[in-house]
Amino acid sequence: MELYICIHGHFYQPPRENPWLGIVEQQESAAPYHDWNERITAECYAPNTASPILNGDQQVIQTVNNYTKISFNFGPTLLSWMERHRADVYQAILAADQLSGERFSGHGSALAQVYNHMIMPLANSRDKETQAIWGIKDFQKRFARFPEGMWLPEAAVDVETLEILAALGIKFTILAPYQARRVKEIGHGEWRDVSGGRIDPTMAYLCCLPSGRSISLFFYNGLISQDVAFGDLLNNGELFAEKLLSGFSDQRNRPQIVHIATDGETYGHYRRFGDMALAYCLHSIDFNDSVRLTNYGEYLENYPPSHMVEIVENSSWSCAHGVERWRDNCGCHTGMHPGWSQSWRRPLRKAMDWLRDQIDSIYDEEAATYLSDPRETRNNYIEVMLDPSSGRVERFLETDAHRKLASKERERAFKLLEMEKNAMLIYTSCGWFFDDISGIETVQVMRYAAKAMELAEELGGIRLEPEYVRMLKAAPSNLHQNGAKIYELLVKPRQKLPLLAKSRLG
């Protein structure tokens, strides 16, 4: 019987750049580091590129790049920051994907991710499509190959999202066990209810979609993943390995894969020295002849699904109420502020949805005067974001415009695309995840909203801000009255920084 182990790490930080300056400003809560990207890189992303393995005498016997042996995804916006600020770590991650491909039968371990961590079931169809395309194109530019799998933010899923992934050529994604509804053997047998996390997580499943397409799904081992993320498994790498081995069963007379998925930041940021426990665990498994490490692409090629699965629609890995954490006061919170209310989430979502619809309407109307296919151009705009050189910009418009554009028309076309980009960044999931609307993550998505509204006003003199702020008044804060007050205190001053800088420079 063939036994395999796969450890997946979801490595992600939200986009943190000031949308007017294009830089990450100092974040005092990340002290002694400049900002949270810098701090978490020092505590997690960098250590995992060169993690020491210790012997019984606490001597270093080997230093390993953990990314070469695990399955992983990095958020595109995080990699963009890392490429500019920690090129050493960035290059080590890219190299790890190449080395993992050599190790795992030509299957690199890196997965793509939806671009800015938008909760896909709550997005409209055009945003779902663009987010997936941007994630794929970003991945191709960095890893120089097409991704086999794609991570969905918060593992939040619905059938339409799976349809889009399958249509784009994505072979698989990873979900939590309680996101499976029922299973059956392919070709015969009856459907069997596996809701409540009762699915067998030791094999791949085929999800057949209404369009006739299909996509493979892996449902991770929930109990072991929970122990890694919130228990004490990372106190000892050997115990970590033993726990993974306990996931196999002699009752299954077939190949098995025991696989787990957690936030990658668990290995060093949330759990100090977690990278070392991971390194020792992987080292221990490497020297165990009864089992071998694999990644999802390799396993899927060798052992295609024998069973079909239907998902629980609008479900995720981090909200017991489906996807309500990102649009309502469902009861999910960090636990750090007992007694606080998250009743601000619904009004914030309503304000963002209203703004998105206004922005999209402006884009659709004016972009059609310049572009042959405004939606396709938006999907391709990631190419300019990845390479904003003047030559690339010119070629981009030559390809997508339906006539030669004058200088002012080109400028307006790019403003329209930047407006659309910011209107998608407002949906970064962290804006709703935490406990109060005044948190840095929520303020950040409101800054993207302000930038989108600013561009809309520059383009057509349409002032969206008064209505947006009025809607924010309905979002109560546990600290600062309401969302409108927070917008006034924490968003508007940042919007004025570029103007102040310009005036001082003369």
Regions found by a protein language model. Name each.
Residues 130, 134-141, 160-163, 167, ...:
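Alpha-helical scaffolding segments of alpha/beta enzyme cores, especially the outer helices
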Residues 154-161, 180-184, 300-304:
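Beta-rich nucleic-acid/ligand-interaction surfaces
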